[in-house]
């Protein structure tokens, strides 16, 4: 994929759907080099549809939103044509709409599948070397290993967010997006 030694990771559509979370995970991958993000056209298409239907974004706005992954991780694209053909995705998830995500994780050699979706069969994916986890769990552990790097990263994300926002607003958004333990650790570290 990109050639880094970092573990490969898939952001499920529910994570890409959250701009604050997918940008945070992207910054962790790109800035701290803790992950090597992989994606597929199928994943981007699913997220685009959800953004148009649920957030009522225009097609163009949704395309720009999901364009973050190919723009920042061009080597992370995984072609799913015939990928993981020997694997029955129905044995990996309860949701047929997530079959392509399972194929992406296996075909790309991903170590992590970041999601809040409980429909994935964790033990079945683990047999393929894929750990299904919420971003919060990964971020908390990674923060403990590199707190200064995370504080710098969060300051940059807050500065870039909508023309610059206070760090407290960014952490509140991260918490609302499902990474409350991580946001709490960062608040303490920032003295908020």
How should these model regions be labeled?
Residues 1-25:
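Metal-dependent nucleic-acid phosphoesterase active-site entry motif
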Residues 19-54:
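PIN/NYN-family metal-dependent endoribonuclease catalytic core
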Residues 33, 109-110, 129:
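Residue-level detector of structured alpha->beta connecting loops
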Residues 45, 49-74, 137, 144-161:
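Extended, non-globular alpha-helical segments
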Residues 74-112, 165-166, 176-192:
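Active-site neighborhoods of divalent-metal-dependent phosphate/nucleic-acid chemistry enzymes
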Residues 118-192:
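Acidic, PIN/NYN-like endoribonuclease modules and their adjacent C-terminal/linker elements
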């Amino acid at each position: 994929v990109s050639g880094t030694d970092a573990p490969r990771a898939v952001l499920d559509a529910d994570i890409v759907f959250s701009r604050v979370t997918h940008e945070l995970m992207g910054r962790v991958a790109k800035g701290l080099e803790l992950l090597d993000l992989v994606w597929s056209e199928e994943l981007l298409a699913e997220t685009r549809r959800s953004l148009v239907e649920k957030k009522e974004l225009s097609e163009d706005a949704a395309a720009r939103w999901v364009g973050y992954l190919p723009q920042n991780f061009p080597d992370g694209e995984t072609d799913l044509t015939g990928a993981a053909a020997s694997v029955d995705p129905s044995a990996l998830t309860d949701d047929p709409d997530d079959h392509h995500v399972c194929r992406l994780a296996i075909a790309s050699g991903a170590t992590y599948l970041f999601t809040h979706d409980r429909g994935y069969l964790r033990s079945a994916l683990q047999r393929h070397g894929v750990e299904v986890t919420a971003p919060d769990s990964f971020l908390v552990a990674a923060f403990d290993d590199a707190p200064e790097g995370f504080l710098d990263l969060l300051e940059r994300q807050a500065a870039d967010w909508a023309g610059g926002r206070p760090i407290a607003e960014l952490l509140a958004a991260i918490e609302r997006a499902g990474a409350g333990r991580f946001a709490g650790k960062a608040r303490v570290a920032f003295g908020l």
